[in-house]
């Protein structure tokens, strides 16, 4: 799916930290190992590659910042790229699963508000859809930033995403609205934008529920209902209800709404 479908809309930047750091192929298997509070990346024979991988990671992350990265997908459980639950070997021979890959750690620290997921979670359609939505939202945010942040541009961005945000969290959407309604609480537009982005990111991380999607569909239907004849209005209501009952996918009422909006 990511290669055959998503590639039509994004430019992938393939990265293998071990290869790019000079470890070559084929290479010895590496793993995370903990020594006190220090986590290292070692081969099974004990050769330490931590400084090499970490030094590479810091340089690569700076290059990705210049490339305006809009999101990233990482390899799960990888000692370099795993975002969470990476096995960490202890000195007593036990293994914990609370590690984070060396490269992933640097990337996530540098881009705390950029969408990221592990490839294994992309098999879940809801998580995949949520991630892709966040990538496009991030791309558009970077466009807003590149043209110069203003209160008006923040308001325009929020209006464009209002209903998608409502599907993720109605309370979160209200918080964002209140934030933009009180810009004088912030010393500069940049501080306002930073606060907005933090909250926007938190809201978008929440997977939309069917109930919230239904509420948004009904809300949007209200804008066009007065322009519809009774049969079309009933059909739209029926489509939304069938989605709510899990008898139709979301795309069906969405496409119908779009067709009615453009009549």
Model-derived features: positions:
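Short catalytic helix/loop segments, enriched in acidic residues and glycine
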Residues: 1-12
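Short, surface-exposed acidic-centric catalytic microdomains
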Residues: 14-37
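Divalent-metal-activated hydrolytic enzyme cores
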Residues: 44-59, 94-160
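A charged helix-plus-loop insertion that forms the helical arch/lid used to bind
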Residues: 31-47, 86-97
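Long, compositionally biased charged/polar accessory segments in the mid-to-C-terminal portions
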Residues: 175-241, 249, 253-256
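Conserved small/polar residues in nucleotide/adenosyl-binding loops
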Residues: 261-263
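N-terminal glycine-rich phosphate/adenylate-binding segment common to multiple enzyme folds
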Residues: 56-90
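Conserved catalytic alpha/beta core of Sir2/sirtuin-type deacylases, generalized to analogous enzyme cores
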Residues: 122, 133, 151-155, 159-195
């Amino acid at each position: 799916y990511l290669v055959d479908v998503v590639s039509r809309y994004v430019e992938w930047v393939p990265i293998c930290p071990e290869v790019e750091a000079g470890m070559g192929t084929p290479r010895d298997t590496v793993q995370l190992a903990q020594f006190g509070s220090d986590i290292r990346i070692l081969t099974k024979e004990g050769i330490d590659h931590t400084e090499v991988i970490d030094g590479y990671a810091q340089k690569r992350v700076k290059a990705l910042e210049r490339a305006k990265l809009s999101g990233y997908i990482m390899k799960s459980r990888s000692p370099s790229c795993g975002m969470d639950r990476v096995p960490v070997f202890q000195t007593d021979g036990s293994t914990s699963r609370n590690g984070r890959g060396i490269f992933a750690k640097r990337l996530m620290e540098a881009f705390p508000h950029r969408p990221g997921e592990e490839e294994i979670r992309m098999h879940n359609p809801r998580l995949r859809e949520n991630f892709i939505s966040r990538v496009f939202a991030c791309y558009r945010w970077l466009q807003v930033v590149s043209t110069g942040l203003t209160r008006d541009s923040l308001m325009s961005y929020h209006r464009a995403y209002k209903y998608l945000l409502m599907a993720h969290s109605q309370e979160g959407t209200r918080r964002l609205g209140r934030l933009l309604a009180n810009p004088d609480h912030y010393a500069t537009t940049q501080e306002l934008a930073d606060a907005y982005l933090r909250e926007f990111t938190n809201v978008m991380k929440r997977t939309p529920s069917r109930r919230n999607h239904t509420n948004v569909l009904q809300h949007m239907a209200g804008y066009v209902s007065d322009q519809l004849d009774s049969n079309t209005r009933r059909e739209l209501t029926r489509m939304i209800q069938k989605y709510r009952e899990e008898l139709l996918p979301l795309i069906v009422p969405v496409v119908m709404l779009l067709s009615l909006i453009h009549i």
